[in-house]
Regions:
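Chalcogenol-based redox active-site neighborhoods
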Residues: 1-139
Length: 139
């Protein structure tokens, strides 16, 4: 379980839908803003595809709340302040310093069905998640 920007405890154990869990390096940075806004702009499509969307970085709830409000995000940002979720999902640090950018598509049974890694191309994460969710609908 992990808190989001509003102090709500989140766990995928209660979800009945697929989950797109995307790890991004830091709030209020140019590349991360492009990525989170990309997920925001396609949020209705994610809902049509039956998926939840959660973002994760090591920012605290105040940082996430400000970032979410500024960018009008409709989905939760999880506060992984001690990198515990990042470690569970084995999200790498680039050069041992910069938090990686990785997206996981988790099916409704809780299985990771796809992992997409690309530090520099945040928008590709959205396209890849949508592609995989469409494939899951055809199973």
């Amino acid at each position: 379980m992990m808190l989001d920007q509003n102090g709500v405890q989140r766990t995928n154990k209660k979800l009945k839908n697929p989950l797109v869990l995307f790890f991004y390096p830091k709030d209020d940075t140019p590349g991360c803003t492009i990525e989170v806004c990309g997920f925001r702009d396609k949020y209705d499509l994610f809902k049509v595809l039956g998926a939840e969307v959660w973002g994760v970085s090591n920012g605290n709830s105040a940082s996430h709340l400000s970032f979410a409000n500024k960018n009008k995000l409709q989905y939760p940002l999880l506060c992984d302040t001690n990198d515990s979720l990042r470690k569970i999902f084995k999200v790498p640090k680039v050069l041992g310093l910069l938090d990686g950018r990785v997206t996981y598509v988790i099916d409704r049974k809780g299985f990771v069905r796809h992992i997409y890694r690309d530090l520099l191309n945040g928008p590709a994460h959205i396209k890849e998640a949508i592609r995989v969710l469409k494939e899951l609908q055809n199973e």
